[in-house]
Amino acid sequence: MPSLGRLHLITDTRPGRDPLTVVRAALAAARADLVVQVRVQDSATDREAYDLAARVLALCAPYGATCLVNDRLHVALAVDAAGGHVGADDLPVAAARHVLGPTGVLGVTAREPRGAVEAVVAGATYLGVGPCHATSTKAGLPDPIGAVGVRDVVDAVDVPVIAIGGVTADRVPALRAAGAYGVAVVGAVSSAADPGRATTDLLRALA
């Protein structure tokens, strides 16, 4: 299994966004410290997801950065990504582990300790925990759990916890103090005037 970077960048494929340009800038700043999670809109076709994932994987390769595919594990397998990430509405964790095999990286979204423990028992490599703060990137999310909620999950499991949801460089120290191994971001990098600089700021906060 590849080493897990502390900064996870989730691709922003909303209309008007340019995910590949953002990924290029972030990789130039973070290199192998970056994990890129390819996430597409629900309306995207599998072919569109495949094309984006293949291009992101090609960008990651020279840096030794890890590429994962969110939700669509068949796409992860098709492009030979390092693994994938599943949420509550995706495949059950045990089924996702079966699809990826014993060595694939499997991230699982969790919100509270009980679900987190169940996910780890079923085969999760790491947990994406949140939302930590309010975010406009993804609609329909539950109320934020804050750093306290992150700590509750960290105390319950023995795998890396990646805090997600409204994460900014200013909020990273509190999340790290709560035990988070790293953070996952969308808007903090993709909406920044300088995605490379934003990536550097996040990495410094994580150090």
Identify the meaning behind each predicted range:
Residues 1-85, 90, 98-125, 142, ...:
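Conserved N-terminal beta1-alpha1 strand-loop-helix module at the mouth
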Residues 137-141:
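Short, glycine/charged-rich beta-strand-loop motifs at protein surfaces that mediate ligand recognition
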Residues 93, 115, 135-136:
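Short glycine-rich, flexible loops that bind phosphorylated cofactors or substrates
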Residues 129, 162-167, 185-189:
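Glycine-rich beta-strand-to-loop/alpha-helix junction loops that act as flexible
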